[in-house]
Swiss-Prot record:
Belongs to the tRNA pseudouridine synthase TruA family. It comes from Methylorubrum populi (strain ATCC BAA-705 / NCIMB 13946 / BJ001) (Methylobacterium populi). This is tRNA pseudouridine synthase A. Formation of pseudouridine at positions 38, 39 and 40 in the anticodon stem and loop of transfer RNAs. Keywords: Isomerase, tRNA processing.
Length: 252
């Protein structure tokens, strides 16, 4: 029974997240249905990061076991054929050993949050950015972000319904940069950690936005973290601006 590793790209807009639900469309359910249609088998996918409703991915990783030994290009192409016209693409498929687990073998996950920072709304990218029309200072946002790096109790930045056993996480990267392409003004928040709490990235993005418009200082952000003052955080940034961009595995 071979195990296949899939690299997956999807637009999260039409889906109620990754994880299969009884009555709502999800990315997991769509791919598992495609697996059944091409192989005749019922397989359960395990992914690296269970994205929320509306969150996108350009390098999600999942694994599944199938009884038959299929060519990897057949797996990729057959799944893509059965997934049409849904906005999901299987970018690659490869056979891996059974000690590989897309979720538990991961040593680092990467997310990107995009803020369109100009007066005019987005026409082409509206489903992939958070439009903030007032001026933001990316340097102030970056300075505040550095106060969140390291191992901390991130209770202030977790969802009330978060099921993680511990709120302690080690944030390895949280960088904020401004990117300009003509009239396109975008602020990009890039972050990496072994794992994140439910809504952590979106909560941090909303709080950093307040730092960018000078409603919070870097010291304020550090104090919110230290005192777990969730009521002082910024708004929960909308899901559409968040993308799962990659996952690292130990090469051993």
């Amino acid at each position: 029974m071979p195990r296949y590793k899939l690299v997956i790209e999807y637009d999260g807009g039409p889906f109620c997240g990754w994880q299969r639900q009884a009555d709502d469309p999800t990315v997991q359910a769509a791919i598992e249905t495609a697996v059944t249609r091409f192989s005749g088998e019922t397989a359960r996918l395990t992914c690296a990061g269970r994205t929320d409703a509306g969150v996108h991915a350009i390098h999600q990783v999942a694994h599944l076991d199938l009884a038959r030994d299929w060519r990897t290009d057949t797996v990729r192409d057959a799944l893509n054929a059965h997934l049409r016209p849904q906005p999901i693409a299987i970018v690659s498929a490869e056979v891996v050993t059974h000690d590989f687990d897309a979720r538990h073998s991961a040593i680092r996950r990467h997310y990107r949050y995009r803020i369109l920072n100009r007066r005019s709304p987005a026409a082409l990218t509206r489903a992939h950015v958070w439009h903030v029309p007032w001026p933001l200072d990316a340097d102030l946002m970056h300075a505040a972000a550095q106060r969140l790096l390291g191992r901390h109790d991130f209770s202030a930045f977790r969802a009330a319904e978060c099921q993680a056993a511990s709120p302690v996480r080690t944030l390895e990267q949280l960088d904020v940069t401004r990117q300009r392409m003509g009239l396109f003004e975008e602020i990009v928040i890039a972050t990496s950690a072994r794992s994140f709490l439910h809504h952590q990235v979106r909560a941090m993005a909303g709080t950093l936005m307040l730092a960018g418009c000078r409603r919070l200082s870097a010291d304020d952000v550090a104090e919110i973290l230290a005192t777990k003052a969730k009521h002082r955080c910024g708004p929960l940034a909308p899901a559409c601006g968040l993308t799962f961009v990659g996952v690292d595995y130990d090469e051993k």
